[in-house]
Amino acid sequence: MSVIRNILNSRSSKGGNFFNTLHKLLGFRPKDLSVYERAFTHRSLNVKDPSGNPINYERLEFLGDAMLGSVIASHLYQEVPEGDEGYLTKMRSKIVSRKHLNELGKDLNLIRFVKSNIPNDQFGVNIHGNIFEALVGAIYLDRGYKYCNRFIYNRVIEPYVDIETLEGRVISYKSLLIEWCQKQKKEFNYQVYEDTGRDELKHFAVKLWIDKKVIAKARATSKKKAEEKASKRAYYALQNKMN
């Protein structure tokens, strides 16, 4: 119990640096600092409550994801009355994309609050978006929907959500390319081939074929990333034909 208390309460005093920094970041006074401590606790600490349940940000991340989706959906519904379900879903996906959430987390420098047994430079890039979602979840638990809605509006919607700009933002180059190939009745294929790189991490190499011609090649640490990278290169190579 003392270990749990020390980890979660080490910064949880009102008037302390953690409280003051959070107050400035959120735009309002947090009430239950322990919720925010949990939002910045990484699973690598392997902390558990008396019932054996893990204490980390992952459940708050789930909650924050749902709150972001709800608030953004409500905003789009009110601001774009002419948008149908498909359009609104597409716009929401662009706003809450992993890339965008990572940028938000980086801009707020949330990683400075994270407690873990892993050096910060060894985290994957998605840590920034994950803890941003966890923070949103913590706000909801601490202050309710009103304050959560206000934070999302001030930090996400007002500075970043411009419908005209979003309409031109590509979520997935692979999806865009597949849609174009299908409309143009073109054959396409993503071929995984042997990667000859000497990186320590395993890489996947992909060739993108369109109408029996290699249009682009790419390599990355996952097949999905390599296919997206190849699709992006193909998109720019074929941009004049696709637009």
Swiss-Prot record:
InterPro entries: dsRBD_dom (IPR014720), RNase_III (IPR011907), RNase_III_dom (IPR000999), RNase_III_sf (IPR036389). Pfam families: dsrm, Ribonucleas_3_3. It is found in: Cytoplasm. It is an enzyme of class 3 (hydrolase). It catalyses: Endonucleolytic cleavage to 5'-phosphomonoester. GO terms for molecular function: double-stranded RNA binding; metal ion binding; ribonuclease III activity; rRNA binding. GO terms for cellular component: cytoplasm. Mg(2+) binds at E61, N130, E133. Residues 172-240 form the DRBM domain. The active site is at D65, E133. Keywords: Cytoplasm, Endonuclease, Hydrolase, Magnesium, Metal-binding, mRNA processing, Nuclease, RNA-binding, rRNA processing, rRNA-binding, tRNA processing. Its EC number is 3.1.26.3. Residues 19-144 form the RNase III domain. One of its GO terms (biological process) is regulation of gene expression. Transmembrane segments: none annotated. Its main location: cytoplasm. Belongs to the ribonuclease III family. PANTHER family: RIBONUCLEASE 3 (PTHR11207:SF0), RIBONUCLEASE III (PTHR11207). Homodimer. This is Ribonuclease 3. It comes from Zunongwangia profunda (strain DSM 18752 / CCTCC AB 206139 / SM-A87) (Wangia profunda). The gene is rnc.
